Amino acid sequence: VYGAASAGARAMTSSSSPGISLKGEGISYMAGSDLPGVIINVQRGGPGLGGIQPSQSDYWQATRATGHGDFFMPVLAPSTVQEMADCVYRAFDLADEYRTPVMVLADGMLGQMMEPVVLPEPKESLPEKPWATTGHKGKRAHNIVNSLYLTADALEKLNIERFERYEVIRENEQRSEAFMLDDAEIVVVAFGASSRVARSAVVAAREEGIKVGLLRPITLWPFPTKAIEDALSHAKAFLSVEMNMGQMVDDVR
């Protein structure tokens, strides 16, 4: 993936939880080299070998520390099979726009579902990548893709520039879905397959007269803090629903 991305191709890799851990070093190298690429994690139980049941326990890994060093990457969380396809298309666009790895964080429940899917139309043209190592036989200066910087000043400068780009992503790329949220006194926050169960629970609670709504983060990084802040105007409580021991709750707080 690193090599294909360096040459300007759209490239992706996929695995499930422990396999993503093994890819962590390479993902860090891609981030350090400002290389676009897509990583798909269909999560299963852990830590260690864990189990093959669905899980959402890689939230921290995806949003905090997929690999070593100072970097983030956009993380998309689909909740349907259709959205899994849509998120992959979106991930490639984000990767190219911001020159960064992007993760699609699904789970084993979604990974084993069968639902109708309408694939988006293929793009007729892709963004130009003048930085890529495409080989022009002396027609231009050599392009170098690298994550090694031996002077502290050079590394610091690049990290500062990268984090300025992250602030642009935080400002422009927060995505979420609101369901029965306008007057909700209790806001359920759930992503991925958990949000499907939460949505049914919200409908049942409404039938009982309970003012509850669902906020579904679609981007886990950047987390949709603006949507959380908007809900604070009427919410009395937030309930974080996730297939783990409580990882997203840190961001909800």
Residue ranges with predicted function:
Residues 1-64, 68, 74-95, 164-253:
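Thiamine diphosphate
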Residues 14-15, 40, 105, 189, ...:
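Structural motif
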Residues 79-80, 101, 245-247:
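Phosphate/diphosphate-binding loops
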Residues 44-46, 106-113, 192-194, 245:
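Glycine-rich beta-alpha junction loops
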Residues 6-11, 32-38, 57, 69-73, ...:
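Short coil/turn connectors at secondary-structure junctions
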Residues 23, 113-115, 197-199:
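Short helix/loop capping segments that flank catalytic or ligand/cofactor-binding pockets
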Residues 99-178:
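Conformationally flexible catalytic loops at phosphate/diphosphate-handling active centers
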